[in-house]
């Protein structure tokens, strides 16, 4: 099956100015992301609204210029996918410099087996109370029951259950991604500010794979410092 990893990257980030171009150990953040994904051997496409961002990575991967007024990263991916000859897509966040080939391959493998949507989560106690970290709870077969910024599940008794932090990397079958794009925003999606709830509210299952790999997206200057320290030790 034909497949591609698409990275949405908007220059005008609201929380961190010109985030894709932020210097990270001598390289722009977006170049870290693209270089890591290119090493997986997959087809890599950057979807950006900026010529400046394009220039940083066009020697590494395909680049599609998209309108600047698209409301979200998902819309940017959809803009590219509509006319793309692919069957399976991974939407990889442009602010996530940690890339693990085994996780990319695993997501594609699940899609090839017939899953419609696949994502990742990892055990993380520290994320439990932080609203900026999205938590997920699963059913017995590894499908998402719910995603929330609130601490879920609630621990009525002190036990050894570890909360799962959602890693915002998504694999889609193309037809499911197009279906998602045609759906209006859902009630729970608007309440939590989480697009993936639109899928659950419309009865589309999301397979969640548990990874032990470290991920840390960059949204603030503090995140940038944390990521720099981690990358130094790789």
From Swiss-Prot:
GO terms for cellular component: cytosol. Pathway: Nucleotide-sugar biosynthesis; CMP-3-deoxy-D-manno-octulosonate biosynthesis; CMP-3-deoxy-D-manno-octulosonate from 3-deoxy-D-manno-octulosonate and CTP: step 1/1; Bacterial outer membrane biogenesis; lipopolysaccharide biosynthesis. It catalyses: 3-deoxy-alpha-D-manno-oct-2-ulosonate + CTP = CMP-3-deoxy-beta-D-manno-octulosonate + diphosphate. Its EC number is 2.7.7.38. Disulfide bonds: none annotated. InterPro entries: Cytidylyl_trans, KdsB, Nucleotide-diphossugar_trans. It is found in: Cytoplasm. It is an enzyme of class 2 (transferase). It comes from the Bacteria. One of its GO terms (biological process) is CMP-keto-3-deoxy-D-manno-octulosonic acid biosynthetic process. Belongs to the KdsB family. Activates KDO (a required 8-carbon sugar) for incorporation into bacterial lipopolysaccharide in Gram-negative bacteria. This is 3-deoxy-manno-octulosonate cytidylyltransferase. The gene is kdsB.
